[in-house]
């Protein structure tokens, strides 16, 4: 079975007895409450930056453990607006270097690049996939002014070593929390550990909207105020524009959805952790490299590695198991980052060459997971 065939099977679900993700089923469990709140919002007069957005910002900031949250259009905008705000405040300057994970989704890097800053790739740890602080320190120059840690796949990327590194070198510490909503204990959650954090509420995320959405969290009132203004065309007061801003605002409908889902986020993350624990305990295939858990994890994705990835995926697909790859092409091999094409990043390339994501979500049943585990253990060469 070709890679294209695997994708078609996943997209139409019907040919896969275990889909990678059934969003309809995930959202069905919220349906009665969502129908009520969406009807209520639709009958109102203010659909942009109204009472639902204000309430969600308060509730989300409280859940994360920061004093402030600003709703924006999506996760990319959240990160981009953080950089734009720091530039406007003079805490960053055009051309400054920002350390970023070499192993991440392209959005992290593009947000830096499109802000007029210079992203510098840092190799990950091969076992956790997270940026290695010891590698980061070797990339520091006099132009390095910020560092972005991505809580990749749902695992907390920041520990005391990271905090010490940022403090020692006076770096802005920015979190990409797109994949780790609710990760960590209260008071230690991702999104509250750095100077500012970007959050995504894309529908597939642990806290997913019914469309696009994002947020910035911080304890810095000046930064939050500027992010809010920049996301509203650079305006604080109607028809008065203090900065050349953008259009990036969380709407009332999505905020209402997120308020409903936020109430169950911790419980949903516990279910993800239960599913992940079973995978870790019961997958015994010696050809499968299981993920290493070094810190708190909420399992946005359950990512294994296999030396013969495509053959393994095809064999699983033949048994009705849908899988995906996050991500097949490393950022430094993308045309959009042609200036990185000569970078030597062997750990990143090894990870991107071998990773496979198994189904893991709140709609996955115990029976479906049993079938996945059985298939994974059977497919050996």
Predicted regions and their residues:
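Active-site phosphate-binding strand-loop segment of PLP-dependent enzymes
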Residues: 127-209, 215-217, 357
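Helix C-cap/helix->beta junction micro-motif
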Residues: 115, 168-169, 319
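N-terminal "arm"/small-domain region of PLP-dependent enzymes with the aminotransferase-like
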Residues: 3, 7-46, 51, 359
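Phosphate-binding glycine-rich loop
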Residues: 46, 51-97, 111-115, 121
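Pyridoxal 5′-phosphate
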Residues: 32, 92, 272
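Short beta-strand->loop structural element characteristic of the AMP-binding/adenylate-forming
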Residues: 118-128, 324
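Conserved coil-to-alpha-helix start sites within the AMP-binding
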Residues: 103-109
